[in-house]
Amino acid sequence: MKTPQFILASASPARRRLLQTVGIEPIVSPSDFDESQIQETEPGKLVQILAQCKAETVAPQFPSGLVMGCDSVLAIDGKIHGKPIDADEAIARWQLMRGQVGDLYTGHVLIDKIQNRTLVKYQVTKVYFANISDRTIQAYVATGEPLKCAGAFALEGFGSLFIEKIAGCHSNVIGLSLPLLRQMLEELNYDVTDFWK
């Protein structure tokens, strides 16, 4: 079977770097899907719906592609948190998160245009937040990093200082679960090494 082009339907530099780390050089084609039109309150369902909508928006442009869509949210006490809209929201979010445990959900969708198949899955990872001071929160938010990430933190950046531990898939917290991606590729009868550049 011919190996399709690997298309990443995301503007996330972290997701692209994760793929590059394991030898996959994706064609990046960010989706312009308006996430605000989806009103789902269960985080596992929400990230799968959003990831699928993103992938489906991009897929028609690549008739022989394998299109990956992803979406991440953080849930604390059942409340869903995406990217904060501004610094004030990021500060308030961190005041809520500090000393708490959250669940980071990432939806993963692969649309294989060659086989006309779609896989939709999600991964969840527990994140244990440090109990940091207001001063530290303000300094972290001032870096701008929390405004770019679901959950208002980046495990691969300054945010790693404020995460006590994670339970589950490390790469899932950064933006996509590499083990889940490998499993999904196998389910589509590909070997991840087929995509190595």
Swiss-Prot record:
Key word Cytoplasm present: yes
BP terms from Gene Ontology: nucleotide metabolic process
Locations listed in the record: Cytoplasm
GO terms, molecular function: nucleoside triphosphate diphosphatase activity
SUPFAM superfamilies in alphabetical order: ITPase-like
Cofactor: a divalent metal cation
One of the record's GO cellular component terms: cytoplasm
EC number: 3.6.1.9
Position of the signal peptide: none
Catalytic activity line of the entry: a ribonucleoside 5'-triphosphate + H2O = a ribonucleoside 5'-phosphate + diphosphate + H(+); a 2'-deoxyribonucleoside 5'-triphosphate + H2O = a 2'-deoxyribonucleoside 5'-phosphate + diphosphate + H(+)
Annotated CDD domains: Maf
Catalytic residues (UniProt): 71
Function per UniProt: Nucleoside triphosphate pyrophosphatase. May have a dual role in cell division arrest and in preventing the incorporation of modified nucleotides into cellular nucleic acids.
Protein name (record): Nucleoside triphosphate pyrophosphatase
